UniProtKB/Swiss-Prot annotation:
InterPro entries: FAD/NAD-bd_sf, FixC-like
Pfam families reported for this sequence: FAD_oxidored (PF12831)
Record's keyword terms, sorted: FAD, Flavoprotein, Nitrogen fixation, Oxidoreductase
Transmembrane segments: none
Purpose of the protein: Could be required for the formation of a functional nitrogenase Fe protein. Probably accepts electrons from FixA/FixB and reduces a quinone.
One GO MF term attached to the UniProt entry: oxidoreductase activity
Cofactor(s) the protein requires to work: FAD
Name of the protein: Protein FixC
Native source species: Bradyrhizobium diazoefficiens (strain JCM 10833 / BCRC 13528 / IAM 13628 / NBRC 14792 / USDA 110)
Glycoprotein as UniProt keyword: no
Lineage, highest ranks first: Bacteria, Pseudomonadati, Pseudomonadota, Alphaproteobacteria, Hyphomicrobiales
Isomerase keyword on record: no
Length: 435
């Protein structure tokens, strides 16, 4: 056993874990961070979106040092059927600001840099170290961790679980249940490399401008899921994900969906001639507010994806992860400054602080949307995209048919497929869940 005792042990070196370790180290706490990968980010080859406001609270000068790809000036949403898409997008020169609001990043590069800042702050970071279980005393209080290293048991006043959505430590220790299949999505992603000037021409970009495309519709074959495309400097991050429960129910494969997505007429021209160099699969928490587990206990707290903190409606995850990690660290620091033990009662302040933040407020607002989308997935991800595409094509095609007849034909198509009661019911349920 390692004799040295730590104020805190952080399990995981992703966004949430790094935020927690950095914040505690800056407070002067003795922090040990454990990561099973070869280096932080080694298991995160995919692209992602970084939200500047949350990063600034951790490292104000990050723009000067961090490996950033492009700042986002445009957001597109596509509702797709097999041959077309109906789009909505927002683009503004206001996002070409001195301190941009959002960036695309490559997680393998960014997480490695982020971890270097954790080390600079004074934390000890051990990679290639797997935490096998939580160490508990005879009163079931968490007092440290056990690892696969020779001197495997390490003690600390508190353990921060930042092990990701599929982390097993809390489950093995009986602290929380394993996420249900209908609360977790499996996403598959590829990195398509192209010359920088080709990417900028295809996406109408200049300099370091970036764009993100999010897509829903028949690409998920009636399952609850979405596709995405991020423009980076010299590559395009492309992927698709659906709920694990839906993959189990339908027998569809994520790889098959990804291949179909890449062949779609709206997507194929964007990646034509590209070279695929990286491929990954990743589990994402999708259950929202109702799936959040117990966030604290005797000697432990849980943050980020491990706490199911992901806004599936707005596709926000890294900002919730960083914020929860920072708030957990601040709560731990507050308990320590009072000279109090890391008991469940004292650590409950973490939940209070998180409840007062945008993290829980946003998740609570949309608490009914994830189950609604899952329960009525065939309507929202298959039927309506097909109906809307057909109606739009009818609307823009000029063939001598009077407009009033076109409108009646489109309405008749909706009513025939879903009925008046179905249409009204879907609209009511969606509006109620959105409010």
């Amino acid at each position: 056993m390692i004799e040295e005792r730590f104020d805190a042990i952080v399990v995981g070196a992703g966004m949430a874990g790094n935020a927690a370790a950095l914040t505690m180290a800056k407070q002067g706490m003795k922090v040990l961070q454990l990561e099973r990968g070869e280096y932080p980010g080694s298991k995160n080859v995919q692209g992602a979106i970084l939200y500047a406001d949350m990063m600034e609270k951790l490292i104000p000068e990050f723009r000067e040092e961090a490996p950033l790809e492009r700042h986002l000036i445009e957001q597109r949403f596509w509702m797709m059927d097999d041959r077309s898409h109906v789009g909505m997008h927002y683009r503004s020169e206001d996002f070409n600001e001195q301190r941009p609001n959002r960036y695309t990043i490559i997680r393998a590069q960014f997480d490695k840099w982020f971890s270097s800042k954790v080390r600079e702050a004074g934390a000890i970071v051990l990679c290639e170290t797997t935490v096998t279980e939580l160490a508990q005393d005879d009163r079931n209080r968490v007092v440290g961790v056990r690892t696969d290293r020779r001197d495997g048991e390490i003690h600390a006043d508190v353990v921060v679980l930042a092990e990701g959505v599929n982390g097993l430590l809390g489950t093995r220790a009986g602290l929380r249940a394993r996420p249900a299949p209908d609360n977790v999505a499996l996403a598959v992603k590829e990195m398509h490399f192209l010359p920088r000037e080709t990417i900028e021409a295809r996406f109408n970009l200049k300099g370091d401008e970036g764009v993100v495309i999010e897509a829903a519709g028949t690409i998920s074959r009636g399952m609850t899921g979405m596709g995405f495309i991020y423009a980076n400097k010299e590559c395009i991050s492309l992927g698709i994900g659906c709920l694990v429960a839906d993959f189990q129910r339908t027998g569809q494969t994520p790889y098959g969906l990804l291949d179909e997505f890449k062949r779609h007429p709206s997507v194929a021209p964007l990646i034509a001639g590209s070279e695929v160099k990286e491929y990954s699969a990743h589990l994402i928490p999708e259950g929202g507010y109702k799936s959040i587990p117990q966030l604290y206990g005797e000697g432990w707290v849980v943050v980020g994806d491990a706490a199911q903190l992901n806004n599936a409606v707005h596709r926000e995850g890294s900002n919730l992860a960083m914020t929860s990690g920072r708030i957990a660290a601040e709560a731990i620091g507050l308990v320590k400054s009072r000279g109090e033990p890391m008991s469940a009662t004292n650590l409950s302040i973490y939940k209070k602080m998180l409840d007062d933040s945008f993290v829980i407020k946003d998740l609570k607002k949309y608490k009914d949307l994830p189950p609604l989308m899952h329960t009525h997935s065939e309507n929202f991800f298959l039927t309506y995209p097909q109906l809307i595409s057909k109606a739009m094509q009818n609307f823009v095609r000029v063939d001598g048919t009077p407009k009033v007849e076109k409108e009646k034909a489109s309405l008749k198509s909706f009513v025939k497929t879903r009925s008046w009661s179905g249409l009204v019911g879907d609209a009511y349920r969606f509006a109620r869940a959105w409010r």
